[in-house]
């Protein structure tokens, strides 16, 4: 059963009480929470949040929390490019899982400001085709070439963000590969682990 969207209570200087969706309240604090999304419309919402925060103040960092497994690369390239284009520092934090293309988003954060909680998992995998493939042999050949081109792009992007050699990344993409938070740090997805502050 869905839990719905929690509301946050706020009071202005005139003691007028209003309620905001929790995502809107977090956005006011420059916090974005990435969960699974399924189409380009969802991706555009996250891109819009980043562009809005950039226009509000390009000097203040944005905290980008990730608990997501995005399967199809074409649904994250726009978000990835936006993260790298804006001037504000993007602090990426994995809590739970950064799976599939979400691991690339995690690695896209500002160097030195990419984190994971101790029990987080990071997973990288070979790109998949959105919606499956059908049609004539020529159509299949076109899709196969696109898939190989996408894989090459991913290898280059992971290389840029993690520093791992391209042959290592190509081998690691052949099957889903899971990393503990510590292993993700050693691989180059993140820079540090965030340890519990309450002991």
Swiss-Prot record:
Disulphide bridges: none
One BP term from GO: protein quality control for misfolded or incompletely synthesized proteins
Keywords for this protein: Cyanelle, Plastid
Gene3D superfamilies for this protein: 2-enoyl-CoA Hydratase, Chain A, domain 1
Pfam families the UniProt entry points to: CLP_protease
Source taxon at top rank: Eukaryota
Gene Ontology molecular functions: ATP-dependent peptidase activity; ATPase binding; serine-type endopeptidase activity
InterPro entries listed in its UniProt record: ClpP (IPR001907), ClpP/crotonase-like_dom_sf (IPR029045), ClpP/TepA (IPR023562)
Any one GO cellular component localisation term in the record: cyanelle
Localization: Plastid, Cyanelle
Subunit composition and interactions: Component of the chloroplastic Clp protease core complex.
Family listed: Belongs to the peptidase S14 family.
Cited function: Has lost the two conserved residues (Ser and His) proposed to be part of the active site. Therefore it could be inactive.
Name assigned to this protein: Putative ATP-dependent Clp protease proteolytic subunit-like
Organism name: Cyanophora paradoxa
Species classification: Eukaryota, Glaucocystophyceae, Cyanophoraceae, Cyanophora
Record gene name: clpP-B
